[in-house]
Amino acid sequence: MDFKDKVVVITGGAQGIGRCIAEEFEKLGATVCVIDKQQGDHFVDNLADKQVLEQFAKNVIEKHGHVDYLINNALPLMKGINECSYEEFQYALSVGVTAPFYLTKLFAPHFAKGAAIVNISSSRDRMSQPQTESYTAAKGGIAALTHALAVSLAGKVRVNSISPGWIDTAYTVYEGSDAIQQPAGRVGNPLDIANMVLFLCSDKAGFITGENICIDGGMTRQMIYHGDNGWTLKQNRQ
């Protein structure tokens, strides 16, 4: 794949999956514009702020004139119903759903021919652990936003989402139960996600839009019941 002279916007691109996506695009010749709250040689500010989004979009267009690919990757806050305040829940939705929506709206007049948006959701958009409501709601929201935008932007921009499962951003190689429990036989790493992002932005994915692709080593496809197929529930006594 060749992304020479393509302009890529990535939210949350300073570390983890976002940084890997940025590096892979750069290797293939793209110009990458990152916004993140973490310090670095990119646009540093808060994605939950409307004026910040407007200034960032203005800077990108003034400098590059157009956008080829928008990758909404920024990580929303994860807190549960016991501890999450109203303000924290709203913040998670602002970063995880409102910012992707508003950046899409701001860039809409400036998307180049063949443009694509990839939203990073999570396998938590379809399954949950206790005390993760803010994150889960944001990830479910962006998965739904994906197919809505795909229809609204039909003929102009393809819009897809990816739902990662367990992705170890330190590239740790796990053995034993952590690996064996995964149908794929291992824990994921950022390249598993970055490679799909590149594919979805390429011409090879030209007939794919409105889709959510779960990359989780098959974990969400397993039926897990105590005593079945070697699975055992061990309940911790409180």
Please provide the spans of the model-predicted regions:
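Substrate-binding pocket helix/loop in short-chain dehydrogenase/reductase
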Residues: 80-91, 178
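Residue(s) in the substrate-gating loop at a strand-loop-helix junction
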Residues: 122
